[in-house]
Regions:
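Function-dense linear segments that define catalytic or interfacial modules
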Residues: 1-81, 91-101
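Active-site lining segments that contact anionic ligands and/or coordinate catalytic metals
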Residues: 32-34, 84, 197-201
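Flexible, active-site-adjacent loop/turn segments at secondary-structure boundaries
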Residues: 35-40, 85-87, 103, 141, ...
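Short, contiguous, pocket-lining structural segments
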Residues: 54, 86-90, 121
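Internal maturation/activation junctions in enzymes
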Residues: 55-78, 104-205
Length: 205
């Protein structure tokens, strides 16, 4: 049951209400949201010499932000941030890239491209979040109750459906690593073993 979430709605991050007495003292500390956001530039990412390394570097940078965001003036935000380690990595410049490639916005090729692009963002943020969890021995709060922990989150990816299909989109991603079903299965097993550091990772703000 979702009782609260942030109003910007670029990310669905669950909050919990606090219980406060008449003296304005916490009887039960709730959790609120710190928006630790960043954005990839689609044009630049598609010409990056190493797409995955670029995303992993962004995850490290945003992890520093979330680890450093101690908003003690609002204890519920500090509490929620320390439990979830949340960031939101998104994208800007999609229309610019499609125009550059003479692909009509909303065409089948544009939809296919966007699906693959965000699949790669998802994959590489998961990879690095798992690496950080393994290094630190820390996962986000209640990781063990998540679909990441039991592996079912990865089912749609281990089916091998998320690969470029049209010749045009294959051309756009030429030279960029596209994870196979086996790669997703390997990542699933690593996440089940060592967890994820971040509760949320993606947001288009």
């Amino acid at each position: 049951k979702i009782i609260m979430s942030n109003l910007c709605s670029e990310i669905l991050q669950v909050q919990e209400p606090s219980l406060i007495n008449d003296a304005q003292e916490f009887l039960q500390m709730g959790t609120d949201v710190s928006c630790n956001l960043g954005s990839t530039n689609v044009v630049n990412m598609m010409t990056s010499p190493d797409f995955g390394r670029s995303i992993r570097a962004m995850v490290r940078a945003l992890t520093f932000v979330t680890d450093s965001s101690h908003i003690v003036a609002v204890p519920t935000i500090d509490h929620g941030n320390s439990q979830a380690h949340t960031f939101g990595l998104g994208a800007m410049g999609l229309h610019s890239y499609l125009a550059q490639q003479l692909i009509e916005y909303g065409s089948p090729e544009s939809v296919e491209f966007t699906s693959i692009y965000f699949m790669l963002l998802n994959y590489w943020t998961l990879v690095e979040s798992n690496n950080i969890a393994r290094e630190r021995g820390i996962t986000f709060h209640n990781f063990e109750k998540s679909d990441y922990a039991n592996g079912t989150y990865f089912d749609k990816y281990t089916s091998g459906q998320f690969v470029p299909k049209s010749d045009r989109v294959k051309e756009l991603f030429e030279g960029i690593f596209i994870p196979s079903a086996a790669d997703w299965a390997e990542l699933r097993d690593k996440v089940k073993a060592d967890g994820l550091y971040h509760q949320n990772r993606l947001a288009v703000a």
